[in-house]
Amino acid sequence: MRAAEERHWWYAGLHDLVVRWVRREAARVGKPLDILDSGCGTGQLCTLLQPFGAITGCDIHPLALAATTQRGIVRVVRHDLVADSLGTEQYDVITCMDVLYHRAVTDERAALGNLHRALRKGGLLLIQVPAFNLLRGAHDVAVHTRRRYRRRELVRLLRETGFQVKLASYRLFPFFLPAMLWRRLTRADGGQPRSDLVRSFPPWMAQLLIVYIKAENRCLSVGVTLPLGTSVFAAARK
């Protein structure tokens, strides 16, 4: 997973979007931010967010925390997003990238309630989840997906747990139809389920994908929304 977070075009595109939002928030606030990366994985996003303030990484998996610590992230916490408190009004920004969908998150509202309590008033939540159950396939089996979401479902959950949604949009618009076809093929192949993120791409193709995603990110960062995609991204305030 560490290699994927560092080199895969999908992670590069996602992290570029998050950094855009956090950079703008740091400029708005005018001081270093207290940032939590909830579900930090191996810590690549934590590393990228360090220039904007004090970063804390939390994850339920001890191996993920060990990998994050190896990157030089000092503040790491083992945390169950449903069962464990994150404290009250501790953070200016919380990122939660592809965590809420996981089968280990047995109560979405409890998880979002924990994130809401941990944010300071006016604080920013950046969250992403996989989109559309019709895209469910071998990748979802490999990464323990409990469910996929429509945009309106994520918006409703955020509002029900006290957030003010500032942006909610699908991401990776051109990938929707290819992903749907790919899911159908990989459902039928009968092989061992594999995450799409372990599949390699030619370097030239990966670079083209990153160029497109960064252009899309520029649109999302100024409030443009997309009608379809393979993920749902939202920015919300407490």
PLM regions: where:
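Conserved N-terminal segment of class I S-adenosyl-L-methionine
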Residues: M1-E89, V93-M97, L112, C219, ...
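Short N-terminal helix/helix-N-cap motif within the alpha/beta-hydrolase-1
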Residues: T47, A104-E108, G137
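Short catalytic micro-motifs in class I SAM-dependent methyltransferases
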Residues: D98-H102
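A short glycine-rich, Lys/Arg-flanked "PGG" loop and its adjoining helix->strand segment in the class I
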Residues: R109-L124
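Short, glycine-/aromatic-enriched active-site segment of Class I SAM-dependent methyltransferases
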Residues: L125-R147, E153-R156
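Conserved S-adenosyl-L-methionine
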Residues: F163-F173
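A C-terminal cap/extension of S-adenosyl-L-methionine-dependent methyltransferases
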Residues: F175-K238
